[in-house]
Regions:
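Extended amphipathic ligand-handling, pore-lining, and cofactor/metal-binding catalytic surfaces
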Residues: 1-139, 144-229
Length: 229
């Protein structure tokens, strides 16, 4: 931001690459807005785009949850054909992941099951859901932007407590998707759309320039002018 100020840039648009409005997102947003409120840098606009999972699709707003589910299923479709997709999120107390499961259940992606490592829905609840669905072939997809080595080991490593091992122990045929959402071009497009929304919202709030209005003479003024001349 300091470099932008030195370059004479006074409008900045930031699109955080985050799934939910968690503590990291809020801290980043707070830090960025400090530059707007400081007279030292001269910014007139600092606008921050929303996380991937924000809008529920009510009152003519876009449905981020449905769009995210569609983007994931579309990207993994060749490998997920005739399989249930299990999304694993590294979440804690975020309601967005349970909302994502509800959106899937209500028709957006009925073959998708969501669980979190430290929150709700739990892995045990996902097992109950999978049992009711009756599908034995699964594709586990990390609901994370980066498919780190640690994450992939937790999902499909040779350790006895990996998600692969736990699901196989329950009698499922399991494949692991070895990419984060950040490599999904359809998810990338969703982030770009959020950035576009931030820009459009800023344009709507921008005060319209006043047009110069020429004075119009009334009849009485015209008559008075004629008498004077």
């Amino acid at each position: 931001m300091q470099d932008f100020a030195r370059m004479g840039i006074d409008e900045v648009y930031i699109q955080p690459i985050t799934l939910v409005a968690d503590q990291c997102y809020q801290q980043m947003r707070k830090q960025a807005l400090k530059f707007l409120h400081s007279n030292e840098y001269g910014f007139t606009q600092v606008n921050i785009g929303k996380p991937l999972l924000t809008s529920l699709g009510v009152k003519n707003y876009a449905d981020d949850y449905e769009a995210t589910l569609e983007s994931i299923v579309r990207h993994v479709n060749t490998k997920a054909l005739n399989k249930s997709v299990v999304l694993m999120a590294n979440g804690q107390n975020q309601l967005e992941f349970s909302t994502l499961q509800l959106k899937a259940m209500y028709g957006a992606a009925p073959n998708v099951v969501v669980f979190t490592t430290n929150g709700f829905p739990t892995f045990k609840q996902a097992l109950t859901f999978l049992d009711r669905m009756g599908h034995k072939d699964l594709l586990v997809v990390p609901l994370a932007l980066i498919g780190s080595t640690h994450l992939m080991d937790y999902l499909g490593g040779e350790r006895s407590d990996s998600i692969y091992a736990l699901l196989a122990e329950e009698g499922y045929n399991v494949d692991i998707w070895n990419e984060g959402l950040g490599e999904n071009p359809h998810v990338q497009d969703l982030f770009l759309k959020h950035l576009g929304q931030a820009i459009r919202m800023s344009d709507r709030k921008r005060p319209m320039p006043r047009e110069s209005v020429k004075p119009v003479m009334t009849n009485s003024r015209l008559e008075a002018q004629g008498l004077i001349s």
